[in-house]
Amino acid sequence: MAHCVTLVQLSISCDHLIDKDIGSKSDPLCVLLQDVGGGSWAELGRTERVRNCSSPEFSKTLQLEYRFETVQKLRFGIYDIDNKTPELRDDDFLGGAECSLGQIVSSQVLTLPLMLKPGKPAGRGTITVSAQELKDNRVVTMEVEARNLDKKDFLGKSDPFLEFFRQGDGKWHLVYRSEVIKNNLNPTWKRFSVPVQHFCGGNPSTPIQVQCSDYDSDGSHDLIGTFHTSLAQLQAVPAEFECIHPEKQQKKKSYKNSGTIRVKICRVETEYSFLDYVMGGCQINFTVGVDFTGSNGDPSSPDSLHYLSPTGVNEYLMALWSVGSVVQDYDSDKLFPAFGFGAQVPPDWQVSHEFALNFNPSNPYCAGIQGIVDAYRQALPQVRLYGPTNFAPIINHVARFAAQAAHQGTASQYFMLLLLTDGAVTDVEATREAVVRASNLPMSVIIVGVGGADFEAMEQLDADGGPLHTRSGQAAARDIVQFVPYRRFQNAPREALAQTVLAEVPTQLVSYFRAQGWAPLKPLPPSAKDPAQAPQA
């Protein structure tokens, strides 16, 4: 499971703080806390104190891990520091604000009003937070060939492969090993990419040793030759190096080399991350499809999967809240289309496989996750559960919007469809066709199985064992479906379902935009204060 975990740093500033000091302005400091569950908050860090300032811009950034698949609730507290003790209880509280880390990274720059307590603003005070990913996302891409390598095998030519080592801590560290090319003294190895940080520690002058060896199946590989270089020298393509065998060089005065290594391509490129796209303004458009087929059971019966408990919930709603609460932070307008399928709908009672939950086909958008919940509760008594379980219509519906977004040729939108269903899909072939077509578009499909039915067909759509194929043999361009049965998480922490089904989304989004060659949109520059007016701590 490829969780999206990376380190981000938060830059913080405030405006119009209330003054607690008599005869002067406050001396503010910001403390950052994270919700760790059970009503507890853990402190992650503090900025420096800025003296005598009501609109501080803190120079010390605060770092924390970012996880896409989790709602990371944060609390910022601003305090007027008038002593040297680390305790905050004896300092004046100037206001606080709460948000999620997802809101910060998707907003690029987030400004919130400071509150002294719920419902009581801290005057005109505001806090502004921006995030930056702490990551060297450069990769070095190379293509290398050799000429006239020494023959090492008695009954054939050599089976050469390359190894690249980085110098550090007085040792040589292996950073890349190529494939073996059998029986060839003039090989060209496959193009490869290595993170710059791993390849040379980020320093293009770091010594690099390259070894060319003859492969032996018992592990006793024979050295053909070696040379020393650096990333800076490798980039001077076409670069050519003599492959030297130290022992042969010492023994034979006439020794020249054991072949030459030629670097055909060596370039440093930026490999964009999920956060690069999100912080560049990419919107994640969230759509929900709910199964209203007869196999769910009569909603008025406590045995029905659609039965609403005395607290107004069921498995469908709990799954929706779990996933939706994470995704909603990445959609600026928080208007989500929501559909039902497999029911007879009024007024003509025809079976529909993509009816708007709010019964407004021209505007199926619901305001936030709560809006979807409200529409679902209102639709439930107005439809007749029927069948069959067809996924293709809703997948194709979302795919049409994804295709329009793709036509723009920018990394501005990505679509996520959440299907909540109680049983096996009926239109298997049509769904396969829809998923394979959608794999070429900026979208992902998440299926949550509700109830205890046999979900084997869903596992096939997940395609973790290999690419999904249509009946005609067309393969999916990438894996875009993630399926999980809800009951596997029934007794797990509430956030466990979202962590599992959303773990692959960052990789799916990045793989799509990378395949198209689309860089992130340029993020909006944070509003900067005049450095000449910045107070000193």
From Swiss-Prot:
Q: Where does Ca(2+) 4 bind?
A: D153, D214, D216, D222
Q: What induces it?
A: Up-regulated by the inflammatory cytokine TNF-alpha. Up-regulated during neuronal progenitor cell differentiation.
Instruction: Output the InterPro entries linked to this UniProt entry.
Output: C2_dom, C2_domain_sf, C2B_Copine, Copine, Copine_C, VWF_A, vWFA_dom_sf
Which PROSITE patterns does UniProt cross-reference here?
A: C2
Please tell me in which tissues this protein is expressed: Expressed in neutrophils (at protein level). Widely expressed. Expressed in the brain. Expressed in neutrophil precursors from bone marrow and peripheral blood.
Question: Do you know which CDD domains this protein is assigned to?
Answer: C2A_Copine (cd04048), C2B_Copine (cd04047), vWA_copine_like (cd01459)
Annotated residues for binding of Ca(2+) 3: D153, D159, D214, D216
* Domain C2, first and last residues per copy: 1-114, 123-245
**Belongs to which family?**
Belongs to the copine family.
Q: How does it assemble?
A: Homodimer; homodimerizes via its C2 domains. Interacts with p65/RELA (via N-terminus); this interaction induces proteolytic cleavage of p65/RELA subunit and inhibition of NF-kappa-B transcriptional activity. Interacts (via VWFA domain) with ACTB, CCDC22, MYCBP2, PPP5C, RDX and UBE2O.
Name listed for the protein in its UniProt record:
Copine-1
Q: What species does this protein belong to?
A: Homo sapiens
